Amino acid sequence: MSKLVTYYNDGTIALDTATSLPYTDIILAFLYTTEQEPLSLQLGGGIAASQSPPELTQTTIEAIAALQANGQKVLISFGGGDMSSEAYSKIVGNETELAQSIATFITQYSLDGIDIDFEDTSSFTGTAAYNGVDFLVNLTNALRTELPSPQYLITHAPQPPYLEVDSGMDGYVEVMQQVGDSIDWLNVQFYNNPPWSGDPSEIISSYQLFSELSGLSSEKLLIGLPVTVNDAGSGYISIDDIVSEIIDPIQKDGVLGGMMNWQFSSDNGGNWATTIGTSIGLEAPN
């Protein structure tokens, strides 16, 4: 079954409204660390009652329970576009401790898993103070030790150049070779990344190529797109075009692992979720 995934960050629309939408998985965003406090998790966004120590709001806690009672999974994402290369470099070598801290947060709030939104391109091009592949492999292994399958999910959210062989930043090709079996799926960000941004033909072509990589399959690949033009610097595609130019062609010839969007609060009224969900065979739980 295809998945429909959304990221929940700013809190302008109540999280519990997702119970009436066909999302299979909701990812809360973001946990992160800083250069100044590399081993102390912090929590951002509208879900945070406290940034440090990281604490969810009571409304979020109640919504998580409602979603899970509905058969929907709720994960927390670590990283995000604002986490710096310097912050990552400070936690290298401490992946086990980081994984333990993340697992403690997940079990404290009865969450279903962790998403890694790693966007430090410099760590794949050799210009960072650490090796991004080694870090992600070590962190994924440590997380899977703390969060065993199938009870817990581990997902990653790479940008497409990270999966394009010989792109000069194809670190995730090796990550998937080494620990793909420990990763449940990838939420690939097909936006803010020319030439994929706004180009269905590029997205479909790369989707097919990525699905053939070691450690990957079409079932483990989700296509991530912005809900509105304001949700990304580039890459917006209208709902109708997503269905007719991306989803339908892929499903006609093969398997679509699912769709992801950034972000939940931009889909006021749920039209994106409902239309895209219907096109991949999903209906609202109730």
Whereabouts are the PLM-identified features?
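Chitinase-like catalytic core of GlcNAc-active glycosidases
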Residues: 1-244, 250-256, 265-285
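Functionally critical loop-and-helix segments that line ligand-binding/catalytic clefts
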Residues: 262
